[in-house]
Design a protein with these regions (language model features):
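Short alpha-helix
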Residues: 148-169
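A short acidic, Gly/Pro-enriched loop at the edge of an enzyme's catalytic core
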Residues: 95-108, 114-115
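S-adenosyl-L-methionine
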Residues: 1-55, 68-71, 210, 217-218, ...
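C-terminal lobe and adjacent flexible extensions of AdoMet/dcAdoMet transferase-like proteins
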Residues: 205-262
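A short glycine-rich, Lys/Arg-flanked "PGG" loop and its adjoining helix->strand segment in the class I
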Residues: 119-134
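Class I SAM-dependent methyltransferase SAM/SAH-binding core
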Residues: 52-85, 94
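Class I S-adenosyl-L-methionine
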Residues: 162-219
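Conserved beta-strand signature within the Rossmann-like core of class I S-adenosyl-L-methionine
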Residues: 131-144
């Protein structure tokens, strides 16, 4: 709660969801940016930023805001905040049909910082943008990992092929709260660091033409995870139905490395 501000009603992020949430400061900045750049009757699409959607819902804004979200734990929280101008669509961004989502004046997205996710998010966002609309993206800054400079060039090239022109790029403009699982791991390792050490660059694109390319191919592994929550700690277990019967299943946990933390 100390670091999540008004967003502590969400369950703790789980590593499998690739979920790093912006701080309240960054969410307020993004909310102001979105509202100032849109007319009162514009529609806004949010991809992968539930805290931004929650913040906009709480402001009781005039613009209509829609979020596409597949994480059911997040969806349950967001539905408590949704109202006439704030709509939650339960769906997978990797599979969502842009024609079913409609067209928007602004799309704001914060995809996981991995290549396949970026291409899928950008493709869907571009297909849902009106001509002249804006795409606002959080991207990993330089030195995030080896080769990130080449990855960014490839992403920007993909944006250009979608008719998107880079309007502005602000280094380390956004900050993130350290998720509990990361904080727990650093604490166990004896490392002391700021809970806001992670930053993202903010890129703004404008849709200048309606060029489109085919949706990038991506096959996501279909895994059946069973989640158990113990005193706020979310544990997921991969289940093979063929190996589980009605008599139950004994589970033993053994650490793979010293100081391993759940």
């Amino acid at each position: 709660r100390k670091y999540m501000g008004d967003f502590d009603f969400f369950k703790k992020p789980h590593p499998l969801d690739f979920e790093w949430r912006n701080t309240k400061k960054s969410v307020d900045y993004l909310s102001d940016l979105v509202l100032q750049s849109n007319h009162l009757d514009d529609e806004i699409l949010v991809l992968g930023m539930p805290t931004l959607f929650a913040n906009l819902c709480r402001r009781d804004i005039s613009q209509k805001v829609t979020i596409v979200e597949r994480n059911h734990a997040v969806v349950d929280c967001l539905k408590e905040l949704s109202h006439d101008n704030c709509q939650v669509i339960v769906g997978d961004i990797f599979k969502s049909d842009p024609e079913m989502l409609g067209m928007y004046a602004t799309v704001v997205m914060d995809p996981p910082w991995y290549e396949p996710h970026f291409y899928q998010f950008i493709w869907l966002a571009s297909r849902c943008l009106k001509l002249g609309g804006r795409l606002i993206i959080s991207i990993p800054p330089f030195n995030t990992r080896p080769g990130i400079d080449k990855e960014r060039i490839a992403w920007f090239d993909f944006c250009q092929k979608q008719g998107l022109c880079l309007e502005s790029l602000s280094p380390k403009k956004l900050e993130y709260s350290m998720p509990f699982f990361e904080w727990n791991a650093t604490r166990s390792a004896g490392a002391l660091t700021s809970p806001f050490w992670r930053h993202g660059d903010l890129a703004v694109f404008q849709k200048l033409n309606m060029h489109f390319v085919d949706r990038p191919e991506y096959e996501e592994e279909n895994v059946d995870w069973h989640e158990v929550e113990i005193k706020g700690c979310r544990i997921r277990i991969k289940i093979n139905d063929a190996e589980v019967d009605e008599t139950g299943y004994n589970l033993d946990l053994e650490p793979l490395v010293a100081t391993q933390i759940l």
